[in-house]
Amino acid sequence: MPATRITLDSTFIDQVKHEIKPHWGELGWVTYKRTYARWLPEKNRTENWDETVKRVIEGNINLDPRLQDLPSQDVIDKLTNEAQQLFRLVYSLSATPSGRNLWISGTDYQKRNGDSLNNCWFIAIRPQAYGDSHIVPTYIDKRKEAVSMPFSFLFDQLMKGGGVGFSVVDDNINQIPQVDHQVDLSVVIDKNSKSYDASLKVGAIDKAEWEKNNSGLDNVIYYRIPDTREGWVLANARLIDLHFNDTNPDQKTKLVLDISDIRPYGAKIHGFGGTASGPMPLVEMFFDINNVINERVGQKLTAVDATDICNLIGKTVVAGNVRRSAELALGSSDNQDFIKMKQDKEKLYHHRWASNNSVAINSKFNNYGPIADGIMHNGEPGIVNLDLSRNYGRIADGYQAGIDDDVEGTNPCGEISLANGEPCNLFEVFPYIAEQQGWDLKEAFSLAARYTKRVTFSHYDWEVSRNIIQKNRRIGVSMSGIQDWLLNDLGHRVVTGFKDATDKETGAPIKKPIYDPQGIKMVDGLYHAVIAADKAYSEELGVNPSIKHTTVKPSGTVAKLAGVSEGMHFHYAGYLIQRIRFQASDPLLPALRKCGYHTEPDIYTKNTICVEIPLRAAHADSKNFASAGTVSIAEQFATQAFLQTYWSDNAVSCTVTFQANESNQIAPLLHQYRHTIKSTSLLPYYGGSLKQAPKEPINKKAYEDRVAMITGDVKEVFENQNKDQKGLELVDQSDCTSGACPIK
């Protein structure tokens, strides 16, 4: 806790509520209420928007390290003023911190878990030391490298709600020693456990029976798993490490894991929220991971094996909670077993769905044919160019040898290149909305830079993370609603055409994009505002400037709050039906029905109701409007290249959509932009072909007919009904186009 605490008083907040109207999108308030509004037990309801923003801003501003001592009145006054400006910015929905910050900032959970403010992480799958971390197995020295460590890091961060990118490239996997032992695993449970019968069905055995048959065995490792996140991680670490001589010096090969203390299915999880899965998914995971490693005795684990272990962990984390586990596996570009691993449909449906898979390349790579073929069939692999990430900030600023030399991978959505153990740290501004709300964009982006800088002063649980964060202090200031903003301010899209050119290295003909000069000037000016803000704040705090500063995040759920296009992506359609799914007991449903929204039972999930909300994109009727269904694959690549060149010194998250007749352009375009785009992924455009599709394009008349049926304001109706409930979330919502990121 800081010695001095900055707070926002009620008089100020009441004044802002009187002066500013939040720019809610059509889906905005409902999405907020079911995703980011925390339960207030003393008021027997969830937060209102002003209460959420107050919590979030106070949680952030008090991370300023000067408050740990006795700061001057000048510092207190300036930080109070900054907190007020941030409150205005976020309350108006001109900008928001990441969904993770909206959910966690200012809570007791944040104070206990410094990691909790960062959305996503990256870890290299190779033996590493645990170091001075909150989780260290008792059977090894904290400085000793262990095969289990990166898997423990991934398991821990996933359970704290973060996404994790992980690298299984050859250089990492080759460092894992050969598997020395098969492990004979037993999982036991006490008859008194509420999970007893269900656990026996998935392979556990009666504890008393096991003890009767195995008394006096001294070659057994017995571990009673505590009902904690750390307990789950340590049990899995013990299982993995017993297979290797370096971490099993006694060469004991029988392991007994006692799950009797683990809370049953449906019990509440305090802190992050959600409900417990019971021990059953954990039991299945233990046996599955043990089988993967046992099959490699006398050999080394492969990239596919390591990815399977990570996927099995991810599957377990998902099992009992609405929130999704987000993983990105990064493999070597010539590892065909890795590239094709999802073609095994049985394993895909069992656990390999748990990660999006990408390959690491450099700018000399030219074998895009097999990659394009995979993309056409299942949308994978994505591409991550580590050479560009290590040696470039913005492409416009040219080659800077080793400017980010520790980079080994990326977060699951690909917008931040990361070193081992490093997290992304995000905040986004909606320039189209901010201008409408009267903001000077440079001030808005400067506030964003300072917000993210403070997050780097959190207390981090893992030593590997603390070290790299203190070195890099990487921030990710993003902009979203980019298509809305550029079309509004320029009158047209930023790519104004293409001209014939030749590839300087190969001589091949290419179509070089032409960018609006004013568009370049707009984003360049904002980039330099972020750099200046970070430099000034770093000097105030006496720390290094951030190694990189800007990005474009995919921004699915957060963009819905303000009703803008998602990140750099084009609106899915000018007019569409957005379907969102609610638990059938949700008290928001009567309010939605009363206001005229169409609801129907979900055809995929029991006890779930599908609500249809008609949406109109900003500028849908403009002759220069383009949607994901009409914009060309070439223009999407060119737009991503524009942002990577002039705005983002990290990377740009983009899922390029393509029509069937454009698939032959994938490989040539990937090659054309090999010196510009740091990471990208592609998916076929499906339109509304699936039943109860999340997004279904419609025409203007259908939209107007739907809107005419809607009467009343859901927020007002819901508040008048006064039937709020605790612990409800939207069902199976997606935070980005690729589905790679956690919800919050």
UniProtKB/Swiss-Prot annotation:
What switches its activity on or off, per the activity regulation note?
Answer: Allosterically regulated by ATP and dNTP.
Q: Where is this region: Adenosylcobalamin-binding-2?
A: 690-729
InterPro entries, alphabetized: RdRp_reductase_class-2, RNR-II_ins_dom, RNR_alpha_hel, RTP_Rdtase_AdoCbl-dep
The record's region (Effector region-1) falls at: 148-159
Q: Please give the positions of the paired cysteines in each disulfide bond.
A: 120-424
User: In this record, what's one Pfam family?
Assistant: RNR-II_ins_dom
Mention one GO biological process in which this protein takes part, according to its record: DNA replication
Please list where the region (Effector region-2) is annotated. Answer: 169-318
* A GO term, aspect molecular function: cobalamin binding
Which cofactors are required for activity?
adenosylcob(III)alamin
Record region (Adenosylcobalamin-binding-1):
570-631
Q: Does the keyword Repeat apply?
A: no
| Keywords linked to the UniProt accession | Allosteric enzyme, Cobalamin, Cobalt, Disulfide bond, DNA replication, Oxidoreductase, Redox-active center
Locate the coiled-coil region(s) and give their ranges.
Answer: none
Q: Which reaction does it catalyse?
A: a 2'-deoxyribonucleoside 5'-triphosphate + [thioredoxin]-disulfide + H2O = a ribonucleoside 5'-triphosphate + [thioredoxin]-dithiol
Give the top-level enzyme category. Answer: oxidoreductase
Does the record carry Cytoplasm as a key word? no
Q: Give the annotated active site.
A: 413, 415
Catalytic activity, EC: 1.17.4.2
**What does the record note on quaternary structure?**
Monomer.
Q: Of which family is this protein a member?
A: Belongs to the class II ribonucleoside-triphosphate reductase family.
- Name of this chain's protein: Adenosylcobalamin-dependent ribonucleoside-triphosphate reductase
Underlying gene? rtpR
